[in-house]
């Protein structure tokens, strides 16, 4: 899991591929699903703010799409760049990254063990590996079918495009926050995880 502190209210989506271009339908699909996830995260975080998702630029590279989250007012739709709003944007970006990391970590299977530890959640996957994430990220992942569907549909679309070899979210300086390789797209395109051996363990929060 990325240990980088998310700063700012924008991020970049990077599509890897030898052609340095992306099919328009795949791009639009990915942006729609990303927007859905962002709005659901904002709702679950209960920020009380209306968030708009703006595409700032399509940049050269493997293929970069620069995304900015801005709070808007209903009457003017103006960007309100305050410290508080930028922090809300950073929290949303961090949660989106965490959701992708968690889905990647679980590899299409249910968690073997889940344990709350204060404001964090410890998760053990089928291979016995451990990840620790924010409670909010785990709760959204567990209880939002909208987010699960959007994540799955995004990676299903990417998996069906042979030209795309990887998907990455970076900060505005193009420092990687989370990366998913082509070989992992199939696992992430599953809408629900399978339970391999019985029910998973839900442990009480440590005191």
Report the location of each language-model feature.
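Charged, alpha-helical interface segments at or near domain boundaries
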Residues: 2-206
